[in-house]
Amino acid sequence: MDIKEAYKQLNEFDILVIPGGGTDAIIKSKSEPLGLIKAFSDLQKKHPERERTVFSICTGSLLLAQAGILSGLSATTHPDFFAKMEKINGEVAMRDLAERCDVVEERYVVNNLRFDLGNPEENPYVRRKSDARRPSMGRKGSNAWKESNTRRESNARRASLRLGGLRVITSGGITCGLDASLYLVSIMVSEEAATEVTRLMQYTWNKGIVVDGIDI
């Protein structure tokens, strides 16, 4: 599918995946997929009742940062590009008069989850990392509260979140994208399905963090 066709079908997409590679040229020329990323996030702000996810792998997060998607959120990227991401975040914050992104060193980072976390002191899955590149608060995994399956989603709550509740997932280096993909399988299908995928792949799922909420 080319970019022109992607724009035509954008309203039908549930997940937009942004891989890394070639980011310097894209940012310098302000070319695609920067416009596509922005258009996808604008769709969510206009129609927050729909559940959508933007998911970057490796240096793809630099493109999300350049598009202004990560302002005020937490995110990660390939560790060799932390300094570059900080630089982009600073430039974008000045350009858009927006908050900076909090860059943390994790396998993956998930923002704008479906349900409120509640009191983090009562949840053993919330942790404060003192050894991260920056201190970060997040919960390992995606299944801390099974009772959240009974919660009713609120469109009003989703609309009040940044980007209209667009779920934003950034992952580190290439294999971190596998871990983040397993997270997506767990929330969109089931934890059991994600576990079965790891069995078939003979892969150990290394979980990242989720920020200020839960998905299941």
Sequence positions of predicted segments:
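Active-site-adjacent pocket-lining segments in enzyme domains
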Residues: Q9-I216
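Short gly/ser/thr-rich secondary-structure transition/capping motifs
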Residues: M1-I3
